[in-house]
């Protein structure tokens, strides 16, 4: 009939349009990598090599819609230029057509959606002519700025961000990335065919399938349950330990560090390997094999900036986020030096600017021989020593031995000022920083010269590129206060290096010069309500007297108070204010929201605040805090209200009287809040809740509160 005939004509017209060859084809194709089953099946059947995304299908399809010497223009995400998923597309294009021109836009220039974009023109011909490329990555400010830079390049082809190159050069680089800005020196380095995989093997790491179940910060679990210094699977099994050190990536840091995690690998990872828990989104795999517990090199796979490589001693497993390379001792230092140089990051930017550093990419880096290898090794070993020494200065690491400001108090017979101790530490930190910066700049110079990249790179580094800390008075005094809390809980001891107690059996002989609190509680108050060692400032005075001597006590209190920067009439008031209002915020930062001290908090009025130490907690802790401390503080509040009422009745000065009334009313509010909190605490205390440290902080923090809110949230 007529309707059917019309439909057939429309289909024929569409088919003719789709099969016709054109002089020019231009499109902004759809970006879609998650296709429905019908589309996915079709794409896999007809465009298998280009099926990573629908836009890559259109790239190939559209150039085949053009006549010989015709042009196809596109605007697409620029990932096709670099990542492995599109390697077959790149190979096909480089073999069959010409990239006539390409503009790589700044990452967020396309304001309608933050998608890294390039726009390019392909010519349906095979020839050896050079293409023209504009790299606008450095020019932020949206499409207006991008357009201006394009116009500038048209007017002046000599601008530094315009490149002309033959696309054959891309085939010299492993993976054939469209690295149009690669200088000839780098191409020659690749051409020598001396990739890193000739001396090292790299592997992606373990996927646990459920990090909340199988991975912990080391400080969450009982320290004696961690298997340290393990060298192979057999030692791990016979140790009967549950937790083992685990590399899991982390922030930018070179040479050594980011050793913060442990993984449940008890009995060769039996629980993980046999995980049938329905809540697991992804089953575990990549179990490390013979790479487990071996020394080597790791890095953070996905970075927001430069790559940084770290030495890993034996005893670690490694995560998917932290790939691992195994190498002999003989070449370790040379390879570490090269990987942490500016040259490596420059070449990685050619291979994959998406900042996703996969093992295959690292293995392909060209490693040239150097005449001055002994000098390189010397700088590398010095850098590793500096970085590892700095890493253990912080209590968030299990290698922590002693707080650095206290390192030299024995030389002064514990009769010294905190200011002098800090200044000595400050100089040591500066010397360490300067040494590492010098080492890295010397290595940069050596490798820049070796690879002939003097026109592209300079050896100098900015301070932010040096991954050890300088001293910082505010931060370091806050850390000193944290150490004091740890000593008062018995986690640390002034007489025993490293951890004194983190689960297991309590050993009173470890504490001689300063005794930790007998109970698992430190009450935080805005004033001294106890008049004895239950008051935090009494304990802090004792701590300072033991460490720095009584002669300098007031001077030291003043220095510390100034560094903490809190308001108050006296130095003691200022320090008390920090502990009462800000200590716990800093603690959450240090322990990355997995606190080892938990803060009981009655609410806005601060009626009751106290810390308890996770590793000393038991089912009777809440009852002890309530009866021995909360009720005592309640009586103190009641007494203060009575006293203030007496003062108010006899005070004739209006201004003074109003101040007393304000104090009384505030104390009344604290008392009312405390009484309400007492009822909640009693409810939980009567339950005698036990915890299992293996469950981790998130689970246990919620568990000990039952169905009420007793603790400051982990945020």
Q: PLM features: residue spans?
A:
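Short Ser/Thr-interspersed hydrophobic loop/turn segments at strand-loop and sheet-helix junctions
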Residues: 290-308, 318, 335-349, 584, ...
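Short coil/turn segments at secondary-structure boundaries
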Residues: 3-4, 200-213, 229-230, 258-262, ...
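Generic recognition of flexible, low-complexity loop/linker segments
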Residues: 10-16, 61-62, 105-109, 230-235, ...
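Signature of N6-adenine DNA methyltransferases within the class I
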Residues: 16-234, 258, 268, 274-279, ...
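Class I S-adenosyl-L-methionine-dependent methyltransferase module
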Residues: 1-20, 24
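Proline-centric
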Residues: 32, 62-67, 322-332, 345-392, ...
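Contiguous C-terminal substrate-recognition/catalytic subdomains in enzyme active sites
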Residues: 233-290, 298
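Terminal accessory regions of large proteins
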Residues: 404, 410-413, 420, 427-438, ...
């Amino acid at each position: 009939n007529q309707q059917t005939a019309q439909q057939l004509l429309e289909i024929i017209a569409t088919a003719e349009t789709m099969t016709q060859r054109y002089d020019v084809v231009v499109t902004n194709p759809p970006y879609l990598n998650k296709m429905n089953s019908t589309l996915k099946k079709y794409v896999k059947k007809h465009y298998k090599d280009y099926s990573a995304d629908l836009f890559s299908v259109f790239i190939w399809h559209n150039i085949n819609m053009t006549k010989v010497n015709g042009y196809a223009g596109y605007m697409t995400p620029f990932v096709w230029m670099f990542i492995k998923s599109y390697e077959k597309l790149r190979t096909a294009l480089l073999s069959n057509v010409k990239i006539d021109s390409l503009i790589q836009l700044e990452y967020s220039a396309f304001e309608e959606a933050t998608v890294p974009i390039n726009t390019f023109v392909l010519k349906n011909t095979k020839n050896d002519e050079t293409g023209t490329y504009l790299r606008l990555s450095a020019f932020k400010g949206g499409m207006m700025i991008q357009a201006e830079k394009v116009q500038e390049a048209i007017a002046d082809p000599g601008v530094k961000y315009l490149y002309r190159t033959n696309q054959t050069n891309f085939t010299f680089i492993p993976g054939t990335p469209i690295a149009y800005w690669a200088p000839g020196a780098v191409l020659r380095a690749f051409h020598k065919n001396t990739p890193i995989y000739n001396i090292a093997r790299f592997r992606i790491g373990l996927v646990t399938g459920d990090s909340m179940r199988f991975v912990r910060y080391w400080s969450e679990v009982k320290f004696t349950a961690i298997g340290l210094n393990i060298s192979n699977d057999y030692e791990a099994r016979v140790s009967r330990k549950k937790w083992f050190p685990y590399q899991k990536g982390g922030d930018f840091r070179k040479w050594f560090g980011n050793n913060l995690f442990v993984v449940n690998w008890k009995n060769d990872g039996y629980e993980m390997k046999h995980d049938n828990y329905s809540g697991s989104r992804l089953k575990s795999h990549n179990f490390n094999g013979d790479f487990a517990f071996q020394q080597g090199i790791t890095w953070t796979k996905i970075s927001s900036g430069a790559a940084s490589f770290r030495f890993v001693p034996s005893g670690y497993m490694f995560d998917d986020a932290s790939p691992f390379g195994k190498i002999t001792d003989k070449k370790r230092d040379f390879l570490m030096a090269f990987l942490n140089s500016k040259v490596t990051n420059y070449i990685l930017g050619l291979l994959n600017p998406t900042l996703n550093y996969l093992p295959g990419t690292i293995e392909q880096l060209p490693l040239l021989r150097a005449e001055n290898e002994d000098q390189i090794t010397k700088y590398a070993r010095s850098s590793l020593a500096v970085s590892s020494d700095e890493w253990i200065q912080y209590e968030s690491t299990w290698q922590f031995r002693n707080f650095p400001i206290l390192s030299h108090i024995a030389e002064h017979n514990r009769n010294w000022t905190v200011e002098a101790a800090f200044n000595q530490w400050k100089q040591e930190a500066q010397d360490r920083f300067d040494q590492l910066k010098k080492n890295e700049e010397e290595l940069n110079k050596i490798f820049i010269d070796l690879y002939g990249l003097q026109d592209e790179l300079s050896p100098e580094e900015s301070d932010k590129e040096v991954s050890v800390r300088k001293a910082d008075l505010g931060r370091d005094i806050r850390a000193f206060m944290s150490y004091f809390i740890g000593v008062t809980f018995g986690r640390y001891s002034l007489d025993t290096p490293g951890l004194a107690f983190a689960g297991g059996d309590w050993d009173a002989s470890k504490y001689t010069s300063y005794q930790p609190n007998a109970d698992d509680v430190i009450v935080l108050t805005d004033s001294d309500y106890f008049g004895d060692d239950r008051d935090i400032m009494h304990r802090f005075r004792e701590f300072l007297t033991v460490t720095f001597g009584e002669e300098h006590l007031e001077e030291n209190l003043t220095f510390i108070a100034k560094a903490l920067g809190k308001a108050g009439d006296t130095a003691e008031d200022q320090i008390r204010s920090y502990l009462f209002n800000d200590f716990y915020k800093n603690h959450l930062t240090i322990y990355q929201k997995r606190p080892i001290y938990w803060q009981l908090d009655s609410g806005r009025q601060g009626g009751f605040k106290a810390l308890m130490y996770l590793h000393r907690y038991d089912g009777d802790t809440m009852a002890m805090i309530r009866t021995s401390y909360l009720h005592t503080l309640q009586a103190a509040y009641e007494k203060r209200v009575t006293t203030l009422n007496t003062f108010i009745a006899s005070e004739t000065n209006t201004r003074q009287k109003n101040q007393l009334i304000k104090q009384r009313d505030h104390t009344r509010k604290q008392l009312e809040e405390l009484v309400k909190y007492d009822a909640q605490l009693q409810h939980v205390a009567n339950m005698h809740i036990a915890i299992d440290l293996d469950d981790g902080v998130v689970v246990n923090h919620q568990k000990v509160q039952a169905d009420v809110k007793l603790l400051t949230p982990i945020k």
